[in-house]
Amino acid sequence: PVEKLLLSRRLMYWQAYLHKTSLGGELILMKVLKRAKELTLKGVKLPCSEPLLYFMQNKITIEDFDAEKLDLFSQLDDFDIISALKAWQKQDDFILSTLSKMLINRDLLKIKLSAEKIPMEESQSLKEEFAEEHHISQLEAGYFIFRGKIKNQAYSKEAEPIRILKKDKTIEDVVEASDQLNLKSLSKLVTKYYICFPKQLI
């Protein structure tokens, strides 16, 4: 039963949280918020809710994340983000408006997964092509073309241990207590590499 639970957990992560569509949407959203914050800090006034504006105007670290900031953060929800994205579609900034349109229209970046690390040359050539086509810098093209990696570990002995109470009243970690190879393999960290880029560059 424990093995089935862990196997289901791994499959759930790959099929839901780490599915290419979910991952692509999350990565674009991160790029949108990064660009919005960058513009806000340069003095550009972007339409959004007060809680969202606060976090875009201020550089918050874990050290100064006090009760007041936590209260503001708790006021943020999907409505704040979606409303902002809808408004940002009409902004003059090419990067912010284009990425916002992608999310609203569900026209996401293409994402390619690989067991091997994506060569930097591959992303660089795509950046050059995209930058030239849209008359932007290669640094700005990095909002649309980027590499990274995702990790999935169905079971971590350190983070979320599952312990078995044996008949002799001793407690043992589930992987050590099991003689099944499948269970041991589920505790291994699986890493996949990705590259995101606009579909028209295929």
Predicted regions and their residues:
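Histidine-centered, transition-metal-coordinating active-site segments
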Residues: 1-202
